[in-house]
Regions:
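Intrinsic disorder/low-complexity polar-acidic segments
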Residues: 68-168
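Charge-rich, low-complexity N-terminal segments
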Residues: 1-65, 70
Length: 168
């Protein structure tokens, strides 16, 4: 099973078996903690829990609301919501992240302000997984992968479409 140089082939990166991807093997506590850290990093990038406010400055009229498992980024024309749904401790999955772009005003949890509602424009469902480089990545249903930083930028891009009055 050696090649012409006497080396044992290790296979292609796609051929490597990922035990965490196997539906019968529950994720480890370490994997669950790593995913929770990535969720926190994403939410901190989009809507920090303690945003620094300066008197007299505007943040492009984006209202950022943090929830225990997500955030709402609201402009006058639209919004982007990010929600994390962890799997149970006994489940074989780590959970899923939903990123939804809305036209209109989304009411955030705990708000007494009610509006006419919002229309869903675009939705991405992502699952966490280990990247080939050893870090965490987010995999969309269509196979697209995002690092946490790139996913945060993608959410901001979706929000910009509404801030600038564009259509998704």
């Amino acid at each position: 099973m050696q090649d012409e140089n006497g080396m044992i082939p290790m296979g292609e990166p796609d051929d490597v078996d990922d035990p965490a991807a196997s539906p019968d093997v529950p994720p480890t506590v370490k994997a669950r903690n790593a995913v929770q850290q990535e969720v926190s990093r994403l939410l901190d990038a989009l809507a920090p829990e303690r945003a620094a406010h300066r008197v007299g400055t505007k943040t492009n009229e984006v209202e950022r609301y943090r929830t225990p498992r997500g955030c709402v980024l609201q402009t006058t024309a639209g919004a982007v919501t990010v929600s994390w749904f962890p799997d149970s401790a006994q489940g074989a999955e780590l959970g899923e992240l939903q990123v939804v772009a809305w036209r209109g005003t989304v009411s955030h949890p705990g708000s007494s302000k009610r509006t006419s509602g919002a229309q869903l424009v675009e939705e991405m469902v992502l699952r966490p997984g280990e990247s080939r480089m050893g870090g965490m990545e987010w995999r969309a249903v269509d196979g697209t992968t995002y690092s946490t930083e790139v996913l945060a930028a993608r959410c901001e891009t979706l929000l910009e479409r509404w801030t600038n009055g564009g259509d998704a």
